[in-house]
Amino acid sequence: MSDSCCSPQSDRKNIEINNSIERSNHDDYSQAEFEKLEGGWFLMGSEEKYVFPGDGEGPVRKVYVDEFSISKYSVTISEFYKFIKETKYVTDAEKFGWSFVFFEQLNSSDQNESVQNAPWWIKVENANWNLPDGNNVGIDNFPDHPVTHISWRDAQEYCNWSGTRLPTEAEWEYAARGGLEQKKFPWGDELLIDGEIQCNIFDGEFPHQNNAPTERKFTTRVDEFNPNNFGLFNMVGNVWEWTH
């Protein structure tokens, strides 16, 4: 999982965070990489049969969001590395000593303990933000990919350091829709445009037949594919993202 950040909100406090993590001196944190959104009323949620009302995915309701800014990209491994290097923060996955990895990223010999109702997620020793599959070093091999194996607490700590905050779920959905109303995707209702897939998702019969090219079987660069109408990249696919 990764996280997208909103720009600072003057007097917002997160009591869950570790107060030993001090804010970075970089007061202009990636400001050039933020998009300011006007906000306003929009239709949040969906009536599609696959939604989970218990998670707030439905029913459709009219919601208002104030003006806010949000980063154009998910937080990358290289950006998260700067945070780790400066603060010496230890993520939850590092504390636990393991995290879950999608089975296709692993050799069969590494596929041991899995999730009972989702056997495609395998428990892997040492998997964390810089070892996405437990072996390959992220900062060396995937610096511009979104950081993964991030808990909600990790995301909050990163925001505290960078002087940003997580978007609310309403803000995130407003941003993801890119100004389109009740469409399945940020570009419309069809997955393909001119026969081309527009996001990094499983392409085939899940979970055993992924027809995506090798470079897109797992995560891909945060600037891959076209942005939505708000100038935001990968607002569907690639990774799950945290909200507040």
Language-model segments: residues:
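Surface-exposed recognition segments
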Residues: 2-30, 55-63, 87-104, 170, ...
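Short hydrophobic "helix-edge" motifs at membrane interfaces and signal-peptide entry regions
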Residues: 29, 67, 158-160
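A secondary-structure boundary/capping signal
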Residues: 38, 64-66, 71, 85, ...
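Short, conserved catalytic-motif segment at the N-terminal edge
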Residues: 42, 47-66, 135-136
